[in-house]
């Protein structure tokens, strides 16, 4: 039985079909749907990504997306037809100083994919895997080093950048087959590849939450 706001949010985000059993749940799930697909804020999707992996919501307004570890959450949510999940993300305030700090801190990226607010997958990889493509951007924007109040606002990466390096699939939806048509070829291959390897090794990648 769901009791807390967090439990309702996780349940809604990790199940493709959610049926409200009471008038109160209709209101709750409508509110969650609105939060999950808010185009102006990714806070809900960041929290879901962390909660599913057993991490807690960050209380700090500065620094990384986790209060204890060097982690950045990069969720992607698609809500329009003909748009696909690509395994990509971006840094909108990158500088050489921050770039070097990310490397020194051995920053981990949690890149997650959402389909109309529903969690499809979570992959984990080191920031170092996407460092070359971000360095190329920094060379264009800040060729002579950092300049006060100047940032690389379009430091983007994609599946092809991290997929050629070691990565982990931390979560895969039990409804993955339903979402496959809306996943890019590169990302789909990376997710299925790890799933196949895990089956061979006798491991389960599908998330199992005690509260469910």
Enumerate the predicted regions with their spans.
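Nucleic-acid endonuclease domains
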Residues: 1-69, 74-212
